[in-house]
């Protein structure tokens, strides 16, 4: 499996509709397999999605410098390859993999400027106001996680040049959206063992249970991609320190929120009896799951910002309610949750507990 994925990196240049794929990005053919064990149907979705396998998290300054100098010594690069908060901006570099509206561009740009404390000129550079682009890396970070969740604990899979979460199915909740079970004639999702709230409560510890690997693209043409990624593969947790804690926490929080939203979509599909009333429908269902995983858009920047600010204020809210807030706010003047009342006053979000306003979030400028 690992060798076939590596071989596919340099061969596949076009997507399913024949459009040219950006050379720095990888389109791997999907492979959806199912396995039934004790009435539990497990889906394994093997795909690279649309993301850069080797250049996902490379610090921009080092990558550009080494490319100009023709540097080939990976050890020298790794000694200086320290992830700084500002380097996380590389996650937001646009790619032509999906369209993005001007509103989405401006909200994502404002989020980056606000959270990483940069001016708007830098924000415009990282996220141009152009509908041809998408905030690909933050958006596709979710796709990357979903593509890697099927990876087993078998050591050979750990080195596949795909960014992945540590998929120990005994402790990794986020793998469970791919698990459903049969209750008579009804298809129901398997209940998670660890909630996303617990993952988010990790504070600035970098969510140590989540292992995101990345590679540094240095010698792209003269060495096989597989060998190169084996040499330069890194784990983001290795880079965790006091200076990088905030950036890594933001990165992983975004991933957790996306995975939770995906699980909600999975639950909706799994409870659709008309579509899944027979076991023969499992294969089309898995194909639909793959399509969702490979094309899922980024969470709304305002919703993400709201969630982060609530976390900073130590306000608790059910994750299912959190991920539904933004879509409902488009039509409702207020959203009542189990613990808070969210009201919308001329675009402002006000979270109130009883009669006290606990959090006020102004809308991101458009």
UniProtKB/Swiss-Prot annotation:
Keyword Cytoplasm tagged: no
Important for ssRNA-binding and formation of complexes: annotated span: 1-11
A molecular function (GO) term: single-stranded RNA binding
Keyword RNA-binding listed: yes
Alphabetical list of Pfam families matching this protein: PolyG_pol
GO CC term (a single one): host cell cytoplasm
Matching InterPro entries: Reovirus_polyG_pol (IPR002507)
Keywords: Host cytoplasm, RNA-binding
Subcellular location: Host cytoplasm
Further details from the record: There is a strain variablity in the inhibition of the host integrated stress response (ISR). There is a correlation with the abilities of the strains to prevent upstream PKR activation and EIF2S1/eIF2-alpha phosphorylation.
Family per record: Belongs to the orthoreovirus sigma-NS protein family.
Subunit: Homooligomer; in presence of RNA. Interacts with protein mu-NS; this interaction allows the localization of sigma-NS to the viral factories. Interacts with host G3BP1 (via C-terminus); this interaction induces the relocalization of G3BP1 and other SG proteins to the viral factories periphery.
Function: Protein that binds to ssRNA and participates with protein mu-NS in forming the matrix of viral factories, which are large inclusions in the host cytoplasm where replication intermediates are assembled and viral RNA replication takes place. Plays a role in the inhibition of the integrated stress response (ISR) to escape from host cell translational shutoff. Participates in the disruption of stress granules (SG) through its association with host G3BP1 and mu-NS.
Protein name, entry field: Protein sigma-NS
Species this protein is from: Reovirus type 3 (strain Dearing) (T3D)
Organism taxonomic ancestry: Viruses, Riboviria, Orthornavirae, Duplornaviricota, Resentoviricetes
Gene transcribed to yield this protein: S3
């Amino acid at each position: 499996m690992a060798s076939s994925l590596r071989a596919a990196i340099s061969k596949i240049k076009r997507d399913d509709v024949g459009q040219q794929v950006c050379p720095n990005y990888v389109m791997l053919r999907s492979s959806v397999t199912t396995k039934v064990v004790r009435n539990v149907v497990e889906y394994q979705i093997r795909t690279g999605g649309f993301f850069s396998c080797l250049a996902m998290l490379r610090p921009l300054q080092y990558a550009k410098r080494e490319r100009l100098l023709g540097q080939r010594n990976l050890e020298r690069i790794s000694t200086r390859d320290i992830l700084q908060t500002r380097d996380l901006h590389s996650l937001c570099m646009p790619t032509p993999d999906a369209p993005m509206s001007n509103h989405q561009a401006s909200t994502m740009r404002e989020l980056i400027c606000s959270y990483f404390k940069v001016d708007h000129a830098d924000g415009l550079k990282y996220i141009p106001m152009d509908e041809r682009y998408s905030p690909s890396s933050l958006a596709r970070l979710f796709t990357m996680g979903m593509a890697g969740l099927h990876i087993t604990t078998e050591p050979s899979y750990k080195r596949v040049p795909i960014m992945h979460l540590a998929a120990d199915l005994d402790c990794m909740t986020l793998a469970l959206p791919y698990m459903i079970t049969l209750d008579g004639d009804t298809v129901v999702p398997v209940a998670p063992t660890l909630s996303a709230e617990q993952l988010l409560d990790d504070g600035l510890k970098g969510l140590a249970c989540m292992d995101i690997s990345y590679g540094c693209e240095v010698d792209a043409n003269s060495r096989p991609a597989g060998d190169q990624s084996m040499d330069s593969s890194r784990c983001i947790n290795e880079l965790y320190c006091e200076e990088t804690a905030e950036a890594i926490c933001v990165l992983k929080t975004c991933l957790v929120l996306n995975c939770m939203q995906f699980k909600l979509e999975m639950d909706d599909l799994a409870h659709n009896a008309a579509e899944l009333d027979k076991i023969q429908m499992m294969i089309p269902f898995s194909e639909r799951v793959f399509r969702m995983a490979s094309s899922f858009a980024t969470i709304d920047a305002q919703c993400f910002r709201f969630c982060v600010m609530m976390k900073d204020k130590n306000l608790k809210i059910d994750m299912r309610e959190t991920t539904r807030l933004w879509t409902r706010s488009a039509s409702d003047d207020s959203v009542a949750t189990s613990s808070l009342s969210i009201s919308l006053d001329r675009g402002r979000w006000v979270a109130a507990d009883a009669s006290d306003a606990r959090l006020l979030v102004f809308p991101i400028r458009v």
